[in-house]
Amino acid sequence: MKRKHLITLICAIACVVFLLIGILCSLSIQVTHYTVTSSNIPKNFDGFRIAHITDLHNDEFGTDNDTLISLLESAKPDIIVITGDLIDSYNTNVDISVSFISRATQIAPCYYVCGNHELRMPNEYASLKKQMKAYGVTILEDRSAVIEINGESIQLTGLVDRSKLSAQQVSHLTDSTYYTILLSHRPEHFSQYMEMGADLVFSGHAHGGQIRLPIIGALFAPGEGFLPKYADGMHTNNDTTLIVSRGLGNSSFPIRFYCPPELVIVQLKAQ
């Protein structure tokens, strides 16, 4: 075999291996752990564990989401926060999402905000909300809830999904006397979340870019464009920390590449 043909063959094999690894490594859920430290976290919330679910898009991991539920159970969260797109507007199956909710609420109290896919389907979303409420899910649509442990409290605030957001629209929802955790579907509004005075923000929406390259990372994300800054990971600016999950499911574009589905577990640490 001529040297030129050999090099071509080696390059072709390398490309196939690269593609296969990228696809295969994106089939299983990756559990990512973060520790968030702040002097604003009450002492009684030191060690408080939060599981973050986002962008399930009525997908399933194992029969009836057994794999996802098992990972949640192993994490032993104190609460589960869900930041939207439980259902998918292109391939809707409310029953899958409701079945997941019925099992997740047996693990820990669940707090939910909607994503853009729910808002595209008002009838299906109304059905989903009704069933989630029946299972005890706290739905935070531009409202807040307080969690108390032995006389100390933190605040959870949730925003209805908006493609455009002004901090002035929603700043009344947060109370600076609490350590405030904000649930909002879109990470691209990080600067507005800072203006609101949120201490910790959970978001999804970007799917980690879905197509990622080693070293480079995400190539594109909705709402952020090419080479997005907030496709995944933990980002801190001033006193606000944003945690963006790559999410779990897919929507109209069915492939993830070097972008595993993600379950995020956050532990609070009082300083």
Task: Give the positions of each predicted feature.
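Extended recognition/assembly regions associated with phosphoester-bond processing machinery
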Residues: 20, 32-38, 174-183, 188-189, ...
